[in-house]
From Swiss-Prot:
Gene Ontology CC terms, in alphabetical order: nuclear envelope lumen; perinuclear region of cytoplasm
UniProt feature coiled coil, ranges: 591-615, 1029-1110
Record cross-link Glycyl lysine isopeptide (Lys-Gly) (interchain with G-Cter in ubiquitin), residues: K634
Protein's name according to its UniProt entry: Cell division cycle and apoptosis regulator protein 1
Function summary: Associates with components of the Mediator and p160 coactivator complexes that play a role as intermediaries transducing regulatory signals from upstream transcriptional activator proteins to basal transcription machinery at the core promoter. Recruited to endogenous nuclear receptor target genes in response to the appropriate hormone. Also functions as a p53 coactivator. May thus play an important role in transcriptional regulation. May be involved in apoptosis signaling in the presence of the retinoid CD437.
Keywords assigned: Activator, Apoptosis, Cell cycle, Coiled coil, Cytoplasm, Isopeptide bond, Phosphoprotein, Repressor, Transcription, Transcription regulation, Ubl conjugation
Record lineage: Eukaryota, Metazoa, Chordata, Craniata, Vertebrata
């Protein structure tokens, strides 16, 4: 990527329109500042004075008649929109017609604040082929710019302008700028420098205090403002008689400018700080500018960009101004039909319009049956394609490989999986890429396609009617789903996989024997990617590219001038896809390789650790001194004394007595130190142990985490995905160690640029264009076949009229039967309700009309881009049903009564469930309708039919289009979708002769007929003494492949089902175990409850017995008490009798 987001120029260097580019007139040019003056005091004289024009010498300074008209129009518009507080520009002198018309003048750089403000048209979108090739040599980026910018950074010796342009303080002329100052910059571009744009001169613009003021009025779009000439630094440029406007202005160009309405006064575009902007040059013809990167082909874009909304806003603002003016001119009066506040509140909300996607249709606008192409034809077709200097011819052999009778079939599932460079292949690759006898006369290259299955293509790109809404909203263009395996040389250089022909390895005579170059392709593909293409059964020769190579020296030998032919093959690589069982075997092999690698790394790490420990132990043995308590210096030998002194880093020289004294002194010092350390050690031992443990734990955790991350990274590289794919092992040593492989979609390959100026990138881009054209032709032919099979539109109308007449007759008969029957009693009340409902509906319609008046005014001026074909279709249906409205009004009461009886059935009829029955036709339309608008315009569909190479006439195409076109649009969903009730869809196949259009009517050479007659018997070959029909074998092979794919799919479904059943069985077993455990617990609890019951029953019996015993004892006690009481009563009675007797006796 370049420094500025993929472009070589910074943002300020690419702000040019299609007819306006920035180019300095000369080096060292200074633009006079207009910042010092206020917009309120500008006049035409001051503007002319700023431009270097005065009225003292009118003979030398005269404008053309068209310029005078522009100045007068500016004065009129400015007076019309004048305000009381603002002074506008005024024309104070009459300009005369010049004596000589200026035809060719150099362009003048205008500040954008004073230049035209006409809205710039958006880039037109066709097939997104870029600028014409004729201007490629002139579209190189300009090396020098003169502009104004703001200082964003400033250091001691250098600074930056607009964050992109580097300047040194030595390049500053005059006053040193500060951060935020506006400066005039002269910069040059150098791609070899760290900062691509370097300023040669910097000059601070004066009047910085007024640079932040905003203009009070916007300059009208139709006025060309006075021109400010550029001057050199410090020197005022002398005006010249023939360089007043420095632009070619014609009378034809002034007419639309004068007719353009001015912009509103109070709406100002938001400007940056200051009035001066990067200059814009006005020229009569497009000047060479740097080509911007083309937008993606398969993105949602419109042909006219945002012009329509701008025009619509202009019209609405113009109407608002006209209404305000009429209100200001007319006196205040009471409206005769003033709306009441209640009515204002009761107004129904404005109807929300359905959001229609932007119409985007792209296709190649040339005949797609061209078998060859030269330099000029390539330029005309692909204006964005870089063409190598040695190229001179290309043969498009795909036209013969995929004729109209046998087109290419999408939907063959295939995918690639690129392995990491550290992962080695399970099988050793013995293929040779560059043999010593490699001959550059022929090269064979392959383009390997990866594609989803047909069902996935339908669901992901077509938005089928039966799909859920979220899946329909996430559609993708088929060109994004079809992908190719390409080689990558460097960072962004795509290349086709292949190499040069070798006579010793591939065989001789490649021009006669087609199998020679196929062997070359197999060998080179095996060497570069590890893919064995020998399994492929069909090799389609897609294109041949020829280069004229001059004489050169290759590997020390001189190669004469020759023609190199590059053949691009398109094999059926999906036959190389491993089966499910083979894929499982490969997955186990790579897992085993991962285990072996991890074990080898672990052993290696353990061996290194043991060696380090051994080395450390030896060093410790040598360097560790003996403890002082174990030494007796007087009894030691001289050598032992010297070793101990050396281990303690002391001098070992001298006599024995000196050595003894030196060692004794050192031992005493060690003894004292050790005593001190023992005291301190006892205090710090506990703290050190805790710290060591925590540090060791942290190191261990960090080591384990790193090992786990490394293990997961290794597993991601070695573990294969679930779905089978062709494994790719790029040869990292090829192409000077810069080779890699990538899977890129067709849309990405089509989005090439002129900067892709490599020969191998040219081949890939050309193949992408040819493959896209092949798909366009096949899908276009599919549309053509469907149009042929449709009946004429008149037959449809007749059938519809007959069915309508029959329905009317049935309704009339039913109505007569209802009249004969007795009327219900409450019919009158029902009629009254119907009348009330009619009145309410009329009131609502009036309200809707009042609310939609403004919308109707805006919609009257809409052009074809604002035309909604879906609404047009509804309106057409309403016109067709207008005749039935009278009958419906008469039968309204009967229908309403009928609806009350059967409301559910009517609802079902109103919203039928749609189903896509013709998926192939839907995909054909969707390939062109990239934004899924649901329709194709008649002009686009007509051009698509012309590009098919069927040589159809306009009358034939018009007749076909009349079958399906409604108001200049073809709604293809009516052809592909139907309700579930009418799901039985039968297609009438057209004759084979009609499929070829008018090609059979063209004169054919006799040579081709003879070759065709000879080719009829090519399908029969002799093999082992028997005649073999290759065509039938291929058909059987295709059938067997389809059966195999279906069997594998069913097997996969069964495996998935088996896995699900295994999971359910496991869940059932787990639940059974849990239930059995619960059952055991319940039984245990039951046993305990039974034991408790027995204990409680025993206790109950004991209590009952005790209670009975207690009752018996109590009864005996009561009896005893009663007997005792009786005895006492008898004794008391006896005493009473005795006392009575004694009393009577006394």
């Amino acid at each position: 990527m370049a420094q500025f987001g993929g472009q070589k120029n910074p943002p300020w260097a690419t702000q040019f329109t299609a007819t306006a580019v920035s180019q300095p007139a000369a080096l060292g040019v200074q633009q006079p500042s207009l910042l010092g003056a206020s917009p309120t005091i500008y006049t035409q004289q001051t503007a002319l004075a700023a431009a270097g024009l005065t009225t003292q010498t009118p003979a030398n300074y005269q404008l053309t008649q068209t310029a005078a008209l522009q100045q007068q129009a500016a004065a009129v518009l400015q007076q019309q929109y004048s305000q009381p507080q603002q002074a506008l520009y005024s024309v104070q002198q009459q300009l005369q017609q010049p004596q000589q018309t200026i035809l060719t003048q150099p362009a003048v750089a205008l500040p954008t604040s004073l230049s035209l403000s006409t809205p710039q048209p958006a880039a037109q979108i066709t097939v997104s082929y870029p600028t014409p090739r004729s201007s490629q040599q002139q579209t190189q980026p300009q090396k020098q710019r003169v502009f104004t910018g703001v200082v964003t950074k400033l250091h001691d010796t250098f600074g930056f302008v607009d964050e992109d342009v580097f300047f040194q303080l030595g390049a500053v002329k005059g006053k040193t700028p500060q951060v935020g100052d506006r400066v005039l910059v002269e910069a040059t571009y150098n791609p070899n420098m760290p900062f691509k744009w370097n300023a040669q001169r910097i000059q601070t613009l004066p009047n910085q205090n007024q640079s932040q003021t905003q203009p009070l009025l916007k300059t009208p779009t139709a006025v060309i403002q006075p021109i400010v000439p550029q001057t050199t630094f410090g020197v005022q440029a002398q005006p010249q008689p023939q360089s007043l406007l420095q632009a070619q202005i014609s009378a034809a160009s002034i007419t639309p400018l004068l007719q353009t309405q001015p912009q509103p006064l109070l709406q100002q575009p938001q400007q940056k700080a200051g009035l001066l902007q990067p200059p814009v040059r006005i020229v009569s013809q497009p000047q060479p500018a740097r080509r911007l990167d083309p937008p993606s082909r398969f993105s949602g874009r419109n042909d006219r960009g945002d012009q329509v909304p701008n025009r619509k806003d202009d019209r609405s603002r113009e109407r608002d101004r006209e209404r305000r003016r009429s209100r200001e001119r007319s006196p205040q009066r009471k409206r005769s039909r003033e709306r009441s506040p209640r009515r204002e509140r009761e107004r129904s909300p404005r109807r929300v319009r359905r959001v229609v996607p932007r119409y985007t249709v792209q296709f190649s606008k040339f005949s797609l049956d061209c078998p060859s192409c030269d330099m000029m034809e390539l330029r005309r077709r692909y204006q964005n394609l870089y063409i190598p200097s040695d190229f001179f011819d290309a043969q498009f052999t795909w036209v013969d490989a995929f004729p109209l009778s046998r087109p290419f079939q999408l939907g063959n599932y295939c995918n690639f999986y690129v392995m990491h460079r550290e992962v080695e292949s399970l099988e050793k690759n013995m293929a040779v890429l560059d043999p010593p006898d490699a001959d550059h006369l022929y090269s064979a290259k392959v383009m390997l396609m990866a594609s989803p299955s047909m069902e996935d293509l339908y669901h992901k790109s077509c938005a089928l009617a039966e799909d859920p809404q979220d899946l329909r909203d996430g559609f993708q263009h088929p060109a994004r789903l079809v992908k190719f395996l390409v080689g990558m040389k460097g960072k962004d250089e795509a290349m086709a996989i292949g190499g040069h022909w070798s006579p010793s390895l591939d065989g001789p005579n490649p021009e006669k024997d087609p199998s020679v170059l196929i062997k070359t392709a197999i060998r080179c593909c095996k060497a570069l990617t590890g893919i064995d293409l020998s399994v492929c059964t069909q090799w389609y020769r897609f294109a041949e590219i020829r280069y004229h190579r001059p004489e050169e020296t290759h590997k020390g030998r001189t190669v004469p001038a020759h023609v190199e032919t590059v053949v691009l093959f398109f094999p059926d690589v999906w036959h190389c896809l491993p089966t499910r069982s083979e894929w499982e075997t490969l997955s186990r092999g790579y897992k085993q390789q991962l285990v072996e690698k991890l074990q080898g790394e672990r052993k290696k790490a353990d061996g290194e650790q043991d060696e380090e420990e051994k080395d450390d132990g030896e060093v410790k043995e040598i360097a560790t001194p003996t403890h002082w308590s174990k030494l007796d210096p007087k009894a030691m030998k001289v050598n032992d004394l010297r070793k101990e002194l050396e281990s303690r880093a002391l001098s070992s020289k001298g006599l024995k007595s000196q050595l003894i004294a030196r060692l004794t002194k050192q031992l005493k010092i060690e003894e004292q130190k050790e005593e001190q350390k023992e005291l301190e050690k006892s205090e710090k031992e506990e703290e050190d142990e805790d710290d060591k443990k925590s540090e060791d734990d942290k190191e261990e955790e960090e080591r384990k985490r790193q090992e786990e991350v490394e293990r997961q990274r290794q597993e991601r590289r070695y573990i294969l995905p679930d779905e089978p794919a062709i494994i790719v092992h790029p040869n990292w040593a090829a192409k000077s160690g810069k080779f890699d492989c990538s899977i890129m979609s067709l849309s990405v390959l089509l989005d090439y640029r002129l900067e892709d100026n490599k020969e191998h990138s040219f081949e890939v881009s050309l193949f992408a264009e040819l493959f896209n054209e092949m798909l366009q032709r096949d899908f276009g032919v599919r549309i053509y076949k469907s149009l042929l099979s449709l009946p004429e539109k008149e037959d449809k109308k007749d059938k519809e009229k007959k069915s309508k007449k029959e329905e009317r007759k049935d309704k009339k008969e039913e109505r007569e039967d209802d009249i004969d029957e007795p009327k219900p009693k409450r019919r009158k009340s029902g009629d009254d309700k119907d009348k009330k409902e009619d009145r309410d509906e009329r009131k609502k319609e009036e309200k809707r009309k009042d609310d939609s008046k403004d919308d109707d005014e805006t919609e009257e001026d809409n052009n074809q881009d604002e035309y909604d074909p879906m609404e047009a279709e509804e309106a057409e249906d309403e016109d067709d049903d207008r005749e039935e409205e009278e009958v419906k009004r008469d039968d309204k009461r009967d229908v309403s009564r009928y609806c009350k009886d059967r409301p559910a059935k009517d609802k079902e009829k109103e919203k039928p469930q749609m189903v896509t029955v013709n998926r192939d036709l839907l995909m054909a339309f969707v390939y062109f309708d990239q934004s899924h608008c649901g329709y194709l315009l008649e002009k686009d569909l007509e051009e698509i039919l012309y590009t098919l190479g069927l040589h159809l006439s306009r009358a034939q195409v018009k007749k076909l289009l009349n079958k399906v076109v409604l108001r200049e649009s073809c709604f293809y969903r009516k052809l592909t979708d139907t309700s579930k009730d009418d799901e039985n869809h039968e297609e009438s196949e057209a004759l084979q002769e009609d499929m070829l259009g008018n090609r059979l009517l063209l004169p054919t050479p006799t040579i081709k007929q003879e070759s065709k007659d000879g080719e009829e018997n090519v399908g029969l070959i002799v093999y082992n003494g028997a005649m073999v029909d290759v065509g039938s074998l291929l058909q059987k092979l295709e059938k067997s492949e389809k059966v195999r794919a279906e069997v594998e799919q069913k097997l996969q479904l069964l495996e998935e089902k088996t896995d699900e059943d295994g999971k359910t069985i496991l869940n059932l077993e787990n639940s059974n175990k849990s239930l059995s455990g619960e059952l055991r617990e319940v039984k245990k609890d039951l046993g305990q409850l039974q034991e408790n019951l027995e204990v409680s029953e025993n206790m109950n019996l004991q209590f009952e017995n005790q209670l009975n015993k207690t009752l018996r004892n109590l009864s005996t006690v009561m009896d005893d008490i009663h007997t005792v009481l009786k005895k006492d009563n008898v004794k008391s009675e006896d005493r009473d009798e005795k006392s009575k007797e004694n009393g009577s006796g006394v």
